[in-house]
A protein has these predicted regions:
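Active-site phosphate-binding and catalytic loops of NTP-dependent enzymes
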Residues: 63-66, 86-93, 108-119, 161-178, ...
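P-loop NTP-binding catalytic core
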Residues: 119, 127, 132-235, 453
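P-loop NTPase switch/communication element
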Residues: 206-217, 254, 258-305, 329, ...
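Hydrophobic anchor at the beta1->P-loop junction of P-loop NTPases
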Residues: 241
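Conserved lysine of the Walker
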Residues: 249
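NTP-binding/hydrolysis catalytic cores, primarily Walker-type P-loop NTPases
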Residues: 391-464
């Protein structure tokens, strides 16, 4: 199988170096945003395409997988002068090195995407046709000068991605989800659904999980809240993490899971494996889409039901989207305390409404009042996460479900983030604060040896 990343030597070439403060030049930004093309860039793209075709004829493609990258570079470098004979512009040393690296990327990896995949500061790569690429860096989207020769070039890269995982994408099956060898998630959609060129969205997979300590360093979580999260997990409260797309739900879920005891058996269930639990006893399950004939699908609901037969101490579902929410609540209510999941919602109250809707999708004949009672008895804590306008991800609130009043689920907010203004550089100013409510889970935390200072919950207490 081909790999999506080269060895560490590939990071040393000039093409992969980006300045954090200024990802692209003003000229590149003008070209990207207004369609202006640089003549030299056009020539280099055509040259690379021509040489790439020549290399396909000359190199032993069957042996490339077993050949070290440096050896491939040497082979390309040795025949490059001959291949450049008809090129009317001489290349300097830096341009030659860059060209060799790009040719290696074409042969062994994902072509123009390789430098972006190698850049650890980039979290998302968004390809809008062959000539427009955006990345997310430090929480903000920005254009990059990366481009493909044409739509055919982009489609070759897409086919390389999907064929490696036994999938296909074409006019009859115009969108697909896949995963790169490093775990990064990929969604591709092509014509006729994509009107202006094929679209690729890559959510990069973190090499190492982000811990609560790292989230504190990033300002996502105030230091004083770390023991609160620890108490919630160790006292086996069932947790629902709510937030929008890209708000950091899975990141927080992964970080909170680090407080689970090593002796516990954890079963994780995901549509696309992202969780990186560090405990020794973790059973990881992943859904399977239907094949080309529409058969063989295994859903999250199937896996949640099966997980109950696997003697789990806790069940962690990466994200509930449909009828599996009912089975997850059943698990939380039947001895699997301390289970956790996430949901797409903009507020804690919306999160509970979404879960109620999902129960309705399960096909179970249940009244709204009964569904809400299930939710109120199963979920103990709702953590709301979000992305601020400056791109930073924050814990926005921590709430506790307290029961039912009539047909309404009752909930109390324990902590919240309060925005107070903006700095000169546009960054959001604010602080976390306690609401003055003493959470009910403190008693359970005490019984598990977790002692949280009452000062932490004073109404005038500002956290971070």
């Amino acid at each position: 199988m081909w790999k999506t990343k080269l060895d560490e030597t590939s990071h040393e070439t000039p093409v992969t170096q980006q300045n954090d403060a200024d990802l692209i030049s003003a000229e590149d930004e003008e070209r990207i945003l207004f369609g202006k093309k640089d003549e030299h860039t056009e020539k280099m793209l055509k040259l690379k395409l021509s040489i790439h075709h020549s290399l396909l004829d000359r190199l032993n493609l069957a042996m490339l997988e077993q050949t070290p990258t440096e050896q491939i570079k040497a082979q390309i470098s040795s025949i490059l002068p001959e291949l450049l004979a008809d090129f009317d512009e001489p290349l300097n040393r830096e341009e030659r090195e860059k060209l060799v690296q790009e040719l290696v990327d074409e042969l062994m990896g994902l072509g123009p995407l390789e430098p972006l995949l190698a850049d650890e500061t980039i979290t998302d790569i968004l390809v809008n046709g062959p000539e427009t690429v955006f990345v997310e860096k430090r929480g903000m989207l920005q254009p990059v000068p990366t481009r493909f020769q044409d739509e055919k070039h982009l489609m070759r890269v897409i086919q390389k991605i999907v064929s490696a995982v036994g999938r296909r994408v074409d006019e009859s099956s115009p969108f697909v989800d896949a995963r790169l060898a490093d775990g990064s998630r990929v969604n591709a959609i092509v014509a006729p659904l994509a009107l202006d060129g094929s679209l690729v969205s890559i959510r990069k997979f973190a090499k190492s999980p982000i811990s609560i300590a790292k989230m504190i360093d990033l300002g996502s979580v105030p230091e004083q809240m770390a023991p609160v999260f620890e108490a919630i997990v160790k006292s086996r409260r069932n947790v629902l993490i709510s937030g929008g797309t890209g708000s950091g739900k899975t990141t927080l879920l992964n970080a909170m899971s680090s407080y689970i005891d090593e002796a516990e058996r954890i079963v994780t269930i995901e549509d696309s494996a992202e969780l990186q639990l560090q405990q020794a006893h973790v059973a990881r399950l992943e859904t399977r889409p239907a094949n080309i004939e529409g058969k063989g699908e295994v859903t999250q609901r199937d896996l949640v039901k099966n997980a109950l037969r696997m003697r789990p101490d806790r069940i962690i579902v990466g994200e509930v989207r449909a009828g599996e929410a009912f089975d997850m609540l059943q698990a939380m209510n039947t001895g699997h305390d301390g289970s956790m999941t996430t949901v797409h919602a903009n507020t804690p109250r919306d999160a509970l409404s979404r879960v109620e809707q999902m129960i309705g999708m399960s096909g179970i004949d249940i009244t709204s009042k009964s569904a809400r009672a299930q939710i109120a008895s199963a979920i103990n804590v709702v953590v709301q996460v979000g992305r601020l306008s400056d791109g930073r991800r924050k814990i926005k609130s921590l709430s506790e479900i307290t029961g039912m009043e009539g047909e309404t689920i009752t909930m109390q907010e324990i902590f919240r983030f309060r925005m107070t203004g903006r700095a000169d550089d546009g960054s959001v100013l604010g602080h976390f604060e306690a609401t003055g409510i003493r959470p009910k889970f403190l008693d359970e935390a005490e019984s598990h040896g977790m002692h949280l200072s009452p000062e932490l919950f004073r109404p005038d207490m500002k956290l971070g």
